[in-house]
UniProtKB/Swiss-Prot annotation:
Function: Receptor for oxytocin. The activity of this receptor is mediated by G proteins which activate a phosphatidylinositol-calcium second messenger system.
Disulfide bridges in this chain: 112-187
Name this protein carries in UniProt: Oxytocin receptor
UniProt GO cellular component terms: plasma membrane
Keywords tagged on the record: Cell membrane, Disulfide bond, G-protein coupled receptor, Glycoprotein, Membrane, Phosphoprotein, Receptor, Transducer, Transmembrane, Transmembrane helix
Native organism: Macaca mulatta (Rhesus macaque)
In-chain residues carrying the UniProt-annotated modification Phosphoserine: 366, 368
Amino acid sequence: MEGELAANWSTEAVNSSAAPPGAEGNCTAGPPRRNEALARVEVAVLCLILFLALSGNACVLLALRTTRHKHSRLFFFMKHLSIADLVVAVFQVLPQLLWDITFRFYGPDLLCRLVKYLQVVGMFASTYLLLLMSLDRCLAICQPLRSLRRRTDRLAVLATWLGCLVASAPQVHIFSLREVADGVFDCWAVFIQPWGPKAYITWITLAVYIVPVIVLAACYGLISFKIWQNLRLKTAAAAAAEAPEGAAAGDGGRMALARVSSVKLISKAKIRTVKMTFIIVLAFIVCWTPFFFVQMWSVWDANAPKEASAFIIVMLLASLNSCCNPWIYMLFTGHLFHELVQRFLCCSASYLKGNRLGETSTSKKSNSSSFVLSHRSSSQRSCSQPSTA
């Protein structure tokens, strides 16, 4: 069934290198043919994505744990976004990698439903935690006095995770272990109505991509307007302070200059965090746009080239978003990784120094014991010589 194949593609459920015998044929009519060359490319791409996502996000979490500013609100959101990216790596990329290696799903029906459920949980969590971080930056810039407190931040993150768990529930009912050929079982999606794949893929696209992108665009539109307005006010205040009337004002002019400079410093710090979240959002859009474009094309166009290699590889590149985020953190918060490297070097130096001290003390003990033995033997010889004479 065309709808079943499209649904499997949409969430990386079925081995993407499987080419169906016919677009209009039933999926249970015969086992799909396997494109071995394409499967090897998929395995290589997924291995690279998995390595980058695991290593990068693990370093971010370790750096956030060792930093002195671990209670920062921005770092709090970064931590949960890194956790979501690790969920994508472990429960979305890794199962798909194993699937491409084995070609078939080997496991019970419960494991099939659980894997498909967790794959979409990571997708929702990564998207909506990024949206929450952007809303926090919008409040910090537009309404700094009414920005969320830390306890509210925790509740918002908890509500986001719970919402993602609930929104992913349809996966449990759509996917199951089914017989796709005589004696051949696979984790497959089945829709009761023929319009089911179109409705489901469209809903996923709206919930994970289109609606978040609209909200993100609104957030950064407000942020850009507020920053532009703030720059205008600071420019006007600086011009007024440098005017002759401001110079004649004495202490008042100096106080105005002090206020302007302090506001400028605070704005630079906030603008830097806004730049970081904006680049993360841009990476999100770049990575997910081809994926959802191909998804919508596959279910709304019966003549879509579902067997084309480029069409299938694009399905895998959405997970690149989980690899990009750690490098963006490193670019804008380099002190985190600098502190992590320094901590690692200090621990390594302390370990090596401890080993050297241990070796030195051992050698001193051996030298002192040999000196005592030689001293005792010489004294014994001096005492024994008169008796023999």
